[in-house]
Structures are given as structure tokens and as C-alpha cells.
Amino acid sequence: MRQFDPWPVFFRREWSRNWPFLVGFAVTGAIITKMSLGFTEEERKNSRFAQRHKN
């Protein structure tokens, strides 16, 4: 006898409540990644934030 697997039921039920969070998280991550990769080496060198967090 197969055991009942609750995960598919859980994900199907919770998807309608959680999709805005997941999509927002993905969009925010894509924007941050795109902006970060767009910096030139000169901009990184002159950044006050980067200077403060340099090891």
C-alpha cells in the first residue's frame, strides 16, 4: 500500500496565496542582479558603499 504524500496537496493549495511573494522575490532578484552586473570597475572603485565594506 502506498503512503499518502501531502506535499503536492499542500503546494497546490498554497500556490494561490504565495505566488505574489514568489514572483516579487524573483523580479527583485533579477533587477538587483542586472544592476550589479552593469557596474563598471571604475564605478565599483569610486563607490562609498564598496569602500566601507572592503575587507
Curated annotation (Swiss-Prot):
Family: Belongs to the ATPase 6 subunit family.
Keywords: CF(0), Hydrogen ion transport, Ion transport, Membrane, Mitochondrion, Mitochondrion inner membrane, Stress response, Transit peptide, Transmembrane, Transmembrane helix, Transport
Lineage of the species this protein comes from: Eukaryota, Viridiplantae, Streptophyta, Embryophyta, Tracheophyta
GO terms classed as biological process: proton transmembrane transport
Coiled coil among keywords: no
Primary role: Mitochondrial membrane ATP synthase (F(1)F(0) ATP synthase or Complex V) produces ATP from ADP in the presence of a proton gradient across the membrane which is generated by electron transport complexes of the respiratory chain. F-type ATPases consist of two structural domains, F(1) - containing the extramembraneous catalytic core and F(0) - containing the membrane proton channel, linked together by a central stalk and a peripheral stalk. During catalysis, ATP synthesis in the catalytic domain of F(1) is coupled via a rotary mechanism of the central stalk subunits to proton translocation.
The protein's name: ATP synthase small subunit 6, mitochondrial
The keyword Iron-sulfur is assigned to this record: no
Source organism of this protein record: Solanum tuberosum
